[in-house]
Amino acid sequence: GSKERLNRFADPNILLKAGISVVAINYRYVTDDETPPVKAPLHDAVRALQFIRSKAKEWNIDKTRIGAAGGSAGACSSLWLAFHDDLANPKSKDPVLRETSRLQCAAVIGAQTTLDPKQMVEWTPNSKYGGHAFGLHPFDKFLENRQKILPWIKEYSPYANVTKDDPPVFLEYKTPPAIGEVQRDPTHTSNFGLKLQEHCHANGVPCELYYPNGPKTKHQDTTSFLITHLQK
């Protein structure tokens, strides 16, 4: 993805009319320069969020009300930001790194909600995504090495980071879930969403799951969800 495509994940014009500032970012894709490779995009997102907060006064932004939106891998990154414990370093010499990395909400489309291959194949038998996050290809190798990389999975999988103090999230998918069944698009299946929603609710975290002809939700799109939670 690219920040030039942000209107695919939330409507910037509607957000601006609602008095909500919009910042779009690019980040590195998974790279061998970091260990594990997924650390690159995720920590780029953290740094961007902290940088925005460091500019709050200059940019006229309320840094206590910031949400994230994204699609696919960007959706996974947004959820990770929403669920991960605060990565601020109050004692850092870098003022940017002293800023909190916590969000007030996240609204995403087509998110991969776990980076645990065991969960993936249990939810969706023809899963094939995620090994690149840890430098393991193909998926079979990813699954075989799961035990060795469990500490990484616990650190970088959104699902593994959910705790009761996390902000509300909104998940949007194109098709209804069917747990345990082969999916036409296993990388963007709403099976990811249903299982995360169950996990969020079990931990007391508000989570809306929207897909066509699904159960009624308070919001039907990412933009309206962001407005609701950022205008509070």
Model-assigned labels for residue ranges:
Residues 10, 14-17, 40, 44-47, ...:
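Extracytoplasmic/secreted proteins, especially bacterial periplasmic and envelope-associated proteins
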